């Protein structure tokens, strides 16, 4: 995954292109762009975390920390990019079916740049599946876990 010592990340998909793939919109679109993508395998997204995020108003005043559930949601949105580019999934909605083995390793605060990787592990009957998610800031692990999804018509 890219770190600060690497050259600036390239853009594979812009936020406008993301909005064509995902149903999420402000304030719940939690990915700014996709910086790496291998069809039907994985995607890597980027989220610039700013003090202007609406969730910082209450989480926590005077000590803003990005809620862990929103880090997991951002990972799931990157996973949605992988799914929504598969021909059989294009007209479906991907929803959470569960999460397993999720661990949070350090807080995410304003000014951080989240690098979010979602790797497709398995799909069954073109309906349900599992992804591995990993989020980093400056090369340090922030969050990791498995995400299960279901595709609905």
Curated annotation (Swiss-Prot):
The active site is at 59. One of its GO terms (molecular function) is (3R)-hydroxyacyl-[acyl-carrier-protein] dehydratase activity. The keyword Lyase applies. One of its GO terms (biological process) is lipid A biosynthetic process. It catalyses: a (3R)-hydroxyacyl-[ACP] = a (2E)-enoyl-[ACP] + H2O. One of its GO terms (cellular component) is membrane. It is found in: Cytoplasm. It is an enzyme of class 4 (lyase). Gene3D superfamilies: Hotdog Thioesterase. Keywords: Cytoplasm, Lipid A biosynthesis, Lipid biosynthesis, Lipid metabolism, Lyase. Belongs to the thioester dehydratase family. FabZ subfamily. Involved in unsaturated fatty acids biosynthesis. Catalyzes the dehydration of short chain beta-hydroxyacyl-ACPs and long chain saturated and unsaturated beta-hydroxyacyl-ACPs. This is 3-hydroxyacyl-[acyl-carrier-protein] dehydratase FabZ. It comes from Thermosynechococcus vestitus (strain NIES-2133 / IAM M-273 / BP-1). The lineage of its organism: Bacteria, Bacillati, Cyanobacteriota, Cyanophyceae, Acaryochloridales.
């Amino acid at each position: 995954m890219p770190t600060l010592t690497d050259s600036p990340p390239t853009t594979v998909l812009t936020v406008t292109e993301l909005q064509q793939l995902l149903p999420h919109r402000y304030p719940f679109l939690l990915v700014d762009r996709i910086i790496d993508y291998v069809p039907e395998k994985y995607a890597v997204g980027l989220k610039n975390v700013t003090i202007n995020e609406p969730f910082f108003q209450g989480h926590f005043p005077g000590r803003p920390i990005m809620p862990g559930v929103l880090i997991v949601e951002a990972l799931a949105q990157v996973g949605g990019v992988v799914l929504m580019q598969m021909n059989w999934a294009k007209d479906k909605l991907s929803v959470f079916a569960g999460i397993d083995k999720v661990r949070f390793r350090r807080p995410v605060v304003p000014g951080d740049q989240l690098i979010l990787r979602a790797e497709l592990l398995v799909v069954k009957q073109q309906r349900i599946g599992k992804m591995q998610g990993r989020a980093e800031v400056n090369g340090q692990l922030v969050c990791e876990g498995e995400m299960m999804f279901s595709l609905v018509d």
